Amino acid sequence: MIRRILVTGTDGQVVGSLLEKAATRTDIELLPIGRPELDLAATDKIAPAIEALRPDVILSVAAYTAVDAAESDEATALAVNGTAVGEIGKAAARLGVPVVHLSTDYVFSGDKPSPYVESDPTGPLSAYGRTKLAGELALATATANHAILRTAWVYSPFGKNFVKTMLRLGETRDSLGVVADQIGNPTSALDIADGLLKVAGNLIASGDPALRGIFHMTGDGETSWAGFAAEIFRLSAALGGKSVTVDPIPTSAYPTPAKRPGNSRLDCGKIERLHGVRLPNWQGSTERVVRRLVAG
């Protein structure tokens, strides 16, 4: 049986990755929907747009992701990241289908010295983090049949991301200062797409309540932004790109409107145990993405 999978959004890193993955499969039909048919800022139009497509599962991946801009436009970010997610949940409940929602490490303060587990207290430092947390709560209120997947440090061959920014800056510079006192788990959107589809399939196939709730899903392994950048340039140089030196700098040397968590590491043991999902090591996935970008 072909499963109809509704995806919120029609572009961006995760949607691009989902479209690529779905193109190789015959058991799913991906239904990406975005503006004007689905405008997450227009609350009253969300449910009719979703219900008209009658999906078997909903992947809620579209979001307001401009972290710094959200500091001066939290109302818009809240409408998209918070209120709209609740409306998606209500529509799913009426249809009797599960929702898999993508969230973020930004719901945490980053003060914990070890990787965060799902039950750790939240404490977002930024407007973006607050609105994403609001979306988690709104979805949980709207429907019990959901899985919230928190991820971090997303990159891919698509959209705007750290890997593409580093490669672009490296074209005209011999050295770059990159923050070294923030640590996390770089995560390829291509791997996220695999995880989303696996969890969606599990929720369709089983009504086991243990498969619902909050899960952490990131690339395996950890590094700093400076370490991530150094690996990107090492890989690029090995493929014929120019050599770029990474100079580690503190967060204080690169001020931004939104505060970032110092520790973005997420413990992914729960999703591996219950859903059988373990994303690949970040270095291997980074090599695959860099190779595509450099070759392209």
Feature map (PLM): residue ranges:
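Mid/C-terminal beta-alpha module of Rossmann-like enzyme folds, strongest
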Residues: 13, 17, 195-196, 202-256
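NAD(P)H-binding glycine-rich loop region in Rossmannoid oxidoreductase-like domains
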Residues: 43-82
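Amphipathic terminal alpha-helices
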Residues: 280-296
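NAD(P)-dependent short-chain dehydrogenase/reductase
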Residues: 137-186, 190-198
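Active-site "gating" loop of Rossmann-like NAD(P)-dependent oxidoreductase/epimerase domains
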Residues: 67, 72, 105-125
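Active-site helix of classical SDR
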Residues: 131
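NAD(P)-cofactor binding segment of oxidoreductase domains
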Residues: 72-100
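N-terminal Rossmann NAD(P)H-binding glycine-rich loop of SDR-like oxidoreductase domains
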Residues: 2-23
